[in-house]
Amino acid sequence: TSILSSMDAASREEFDFLSNITMQWNLLMDFVCYIERHNIDSAERFIASIETIDRVDFMYGIFSGLLPRQTVKEALEGNLEALDTDSPIFRHYVSVERARWLIEHEKDVRTRISTFLKVYWEQVFSRLWQDIGVRELDCLADERRLLGQIGAESYIRNCHPQIVIEQGAIRFEKQVELSYRRTDIENVVVIISAFIAPDLMVNCVEGCLTIYKGISLPLRSSVEVSEEI
């Protein structure tokens, strides 16, 4: 039985609502990428912080740093015309209508995300993490050893077949191709995850490029993980 099918009707309805407004959770993952630059050492504290974080920071992270912080601030203060409809973010990433709706309902969205994630963590994911998290940590030694053997550039390239490193840029051959100039990247963070493969997930905010590397966990015990997680 999948995790979602075991939810009560109200929880499933809330999951579907939040999934829809965050583009199947992609916008929330961008926010997590933004916050994770400062390390998330406690899921409980991170979830609780969603409701108290500065609202400009919240929306800036939701939009993956693709909208200038000043633009986000002006829009939150009521000037929705500050959102430039010709911006690439609205052509390739999120519609301007969705962006305006999220900004207008920012407080309610934050509260509902925080409330749902708290329930999800306590009732579902914390139990899985007790096993999966430990096994992900076990993989770190192998990843560090590989990094030392082949060097940073080759390691990054080998995180996913859609990553292309060129002389002046790093390119990601996704449905909407992404490319970042090397001079715009101050540091690279690679996060290993058992939930990403085979997809490529990347984010670059304020010079910090985050790449999620999908890994296969060593078999230690039988834990079934639903694709819907």
Please provide the spans of the model-predicted regions:
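N-terminal low-complexity or simple alpha-helical regulatory segments
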Residues: T1-F116
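Long, highly charged low-complexity segments enriched in Glu/Asp and Lys/Arg with interspersed Ser/Thr
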Residues: L217-P218
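DNA-contacting interfaces and partner/effector-binding or oligomerization modules
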Residues: Q70-C208
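Helix-turn-helix DNA-binding segment
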Residues: E227-I229
